[in-house]
């Protein structure tokens, strides 16, 4: 019979690293949001005004997508953290079962 083992500690380290990446990405998104959602018109002609409005709308779309991505990212991190605990408990149960 073959056995599969995991390293729950490495799963936990991966979850922690991914969490830090998410924090960094969110901080970056928060920093650029005013710049990409309030694009100033370079001139007062109609084309410049419409173009700046278009860029601002794209900025709002980016902000909405970034929020959704953050929720998905945090859900993935939470899944990894839960998996770490599950794998750890399974490994303990397997060790207890094979040592008797």
From Swiss-Prot:
Entry's localization field: Secreted, Cell wall
Deletion phenotype: Knock-down of the gene alters the colony morphology and slows down growth. Knock-down induces aggregation, early biofilm formation and changes in cell wall lipid composition. It also results in decreased survival of Mycobacterium inside macrophages and reduced necrotic death of THP-1 macrophages.
Induction comment: Coexpressed with PPE17.
Any one of the GO BP annotations: cell wall organization
Enzyme Commission number(s): 3.1.1.6
Superkingdom to which the source organism belongs: Bacteria
Record-linked SUPFAM superfamilies: PE/PPE dimer-like (SSF140459)
Pfam families: PE (PF00934)
Protein keywords: Cell wall, Cell wall biogenesis/degradation, Hydrolase, Secreted, Virulence
Annotated TM spans: none
Note: Elicits a strong B-cell humoral response among different clinical categories of both adult and child tuberculosis patients. Expression in non-pathogenic M.smegmatis (Msmeg) strain induces necrotic cell death of macrophage after infection and significantly decreased IL-6 production compared to controls. Msmeg-PE11 bacilli exhibit altered colony morphology and cell wall lipid composition leading to a marked increase in resistance against various environmental stressors and antibiotics. Mice infected with Msmeg-PE11 have higher bacterial load, show exacerbated organ pathology and mortality. The liver and lung of Msmeg-PE11-infected mice have higher levels of IL-10, IL-4 and TNF-alpha cytokines.
Entry's family note: Belongs to the mycobacterial PE family.
Function text: Involved in cell wall lipids remodeling and in virulence. Restricts the biofilm growth and is essential for the optimal intracellular survival of M.tuberculosis. Shows esterase activity with a preference for short-chain esters, particularly pNP-acetate (C2) and pNP-butyrate (C4). Has weaker activity with pNP-octanoate (C8), pNP-laurate (C12) and pNP-myristate (C14). Shows weak long-chain triacylglycerol (TAG) hydrolase activity in vitro. Not necessary for PPE17 stability or for its localization on the mycobacterial surface.
Protein name: Esterase PE11
């Amino acid at each position: 019979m073959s056995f599969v083992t995991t390293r729950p500690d490495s799963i936990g380290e991966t979850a922690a690293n991914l969490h830090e990446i998410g924090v960094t990405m969110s901080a970056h998104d928060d920093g650029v949001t005013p710049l990409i959602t309030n694009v100033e018109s370079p001139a007062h002609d109609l084309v410049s005004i419409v173009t700046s409005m278009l860029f601002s709308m794209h900025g709002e779309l980016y902000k909405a997508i970034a929020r959704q991505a953050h929720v998905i990212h945090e859900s993935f991190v939470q899944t990894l953290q839960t998996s770490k605990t599950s794998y750890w408990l399974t490994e303990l149960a397997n060790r207890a079962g094979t040592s008797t």
